[in-house]
């Protein structure tokens, strides 16, 4: 049997905040400066910004509406003892990801009674933060994708 036909096709779950952008022309986000051109959001600006539309990019829209695509929960005694260090790793991971992918951003890092809660505008950043925590500090990582919605819940525990 042909190997390319032997694969099961998985349904695609796309970010609902991106659906409206597939037919748009050149656009600049007035809040963050990201540019939409040729079907992609970038930090490189537009070739011809004179005819560009202005609209919030999907990341700025998620931030304004407080609708995260990812949540990371950090729990355990280690978290309370190393909050600044963990926050630094989270921010550095965001800077690296955001440099190439403008829609992957931190929304908030919040203190909670049993640890930290981090929200992101994209699935990939949440997953990448989880893997960075596990690689740097070991601990127990659990990543749960919502099968119906564009959302990921990441749990990291270290006592």
Model regions: which residues?
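N-terminal cysteine/histidine-rich coordination modules
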Residues: 1-65
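Long C-terminal interaction/binding lobes of large macromolecular proteins
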Residues: 2, 6, 21, 28, ...
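A broad, structure-centric signal for solvent-exposed, well-ordered loop/edge residues
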Residues: 43-45, 81, 116, 127, ...
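Surface-exposed, low-hydrophobicity interaction/linker segments
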Residues: 66-104, 109
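Short aromatic/hydrophobic contact patches that present stacked aromatics
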Residues: 71, 115-117
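Hydrophobic side chains in well-ordered alpha-helices
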Residues: 86, 128-129
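Short hydrophobic/aromatic beta-strand micro-patches
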Residues: 119-121
């Amino acid at each position: 049997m042909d190997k390319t036909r032997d694969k099961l096709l998985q349904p695609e779950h796309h970010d609902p905040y991106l659906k409206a952008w597939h037919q748009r022309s050149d656009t600049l986000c007035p809040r963050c400066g990201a540019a939409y051109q040729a079907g992609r959001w970038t930090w490189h600006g537009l070739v011809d910004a004179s005819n560009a539309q202005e609209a919030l990019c999907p990341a700025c829209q998620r931030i304004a509406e407080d609708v995260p695509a990812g949540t990371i929960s950090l729990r355990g005694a280690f978290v309370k003892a190393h909050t600044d260090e963990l926050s630094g790793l989270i921010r550095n991971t965001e800077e690296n990801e955001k440099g190439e992918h403008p829609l992957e951003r931190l929304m908030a890092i919040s203190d909670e009674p049993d640890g930290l809660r981090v929200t992101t505008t994209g699935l990939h950043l949440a997953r990448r933060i989880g893997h960075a925590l596990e690689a740097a500090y070991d601990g127990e990582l659990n990543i749960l994708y919502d099968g119906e919605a564009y959302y990921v819940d990441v749990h990291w525990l270290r006592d």
